[in-house]
Design a protein with these regions (language model features):
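Compositionally biased terminal segments of proteins
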Residues: 1-166
């Protein structure tokens, strides 16, 4: 599966619908260079009446079916397309992250075709996986931390030297 094809399609529809969500999980980590895999694409979004309407429009436009597994406990909306097994999960909250706004403030816009998606920072992905504590999340932590260290080193190398007062 080339996730880039799906992410371009999703970014296009988000733009058409003015739907805002932050890409999280292994898909977000892979975009930042982590050698991880996933069978789904996860987003964190605000659970508002208008966003629920937008999710329904997104599902219709992309030929997806909306499921709400474990409702009301999970507050997660799963959108699936049978023809190619695309699975997109929209979470209302995730472990380790206090608010959507805080996650969004640290996210980076990434281009997919001529549209952009917000992608969670590697620090937030690591924090969430550690807080979730599930074996599948803990299994990738060392890999994610190694990639994050490389990201930090690149950012430090790009940062200008602070001016020294004389």
């Amino acid at each position: 599966m080339d996730a880039g094809i799906y992410l371009r399609e999703i970014a296009e529809q988000f733009a058409k619908l003015s739907l805002e969500a932050v890409l999280i999980g292994n898909a977000a980590a892979a975009i930042q260079g982590a050698p991880v895999t996933t069978i789904d694409i996860d987003f964190l979004f605000r659970n508002t009446p208008s966003n629920i309407v937008k999710l329904k429009k997104l599902a219709k436009a992309m030929g997806l079916v909306i499921f709400n597994p474990l409702y009301p406990a999970s507050q997660m909306f799963r959108l699936m397309r049978e023809s190619d097994t695309l699975q997109v999960d929209f979470c209302v909250r995730i472990s380790g992250i206090r608010t959507y706004e805080s996650l969004r403030s640290r996210a980076t816009p990434v281009s997919f075709g001529d549209k952009k998606l917000l992608v969670a920072s590697m620090a937030d992905i690591i924090k969430s996986k550690r807080a979730a504590g599930r074996p599948k999340d803990l299994a990738v932590l060392v890999t994610l931390e190694e990639v994050y260290a490389k990201i930090q080193a690149r950012e430090k190398a790009k940062a200008p030297e602070p001016e020294k007062a004389i």
